[in-house]
Amino acid sequence: MSFFQLLMKRKELIPLVVFMTVAAGGASSFAVYSLWKTDVILDRKKNPEPWETVDPTVPQKLITINQQWKPIEELQNVQRVTK
């Protein structure tokens, strides 16, 4: 008995199969889409320090609302002392 014959015999499974197929396709598409982003690194041998090439002016978040970069005074003091 093939899969399609089973679906024709039990028609109540058709919506479940459709929803599961759409969900699996969407999850796979999102996984592939996420792998093509610039902040995902698949090959660490070519670029062992990828954080050096990140542009600080380009937001890495999906949405940034009223976010301004300011240096933290305490952190700057610690960096000056440790250098």
Swiss-Prot record:
The keyword Nucleus applies. Keywords: Nucleus. Expressed mainly in stomach, placenta, small intestine and colon, as well as in normal mucosa of esophagus. Down-regulated in esophageal squamous cell carcinoma. It is found in: Nucleus. GO terms for biological process: response to bacterium. InterPro entries: B12D. Belongs to the complex I NDUFA4 subunit family. This is Normal mucosa of esophagus-specific gene 1 protein. It comes from Homo sapiens. The gene is NMES1.
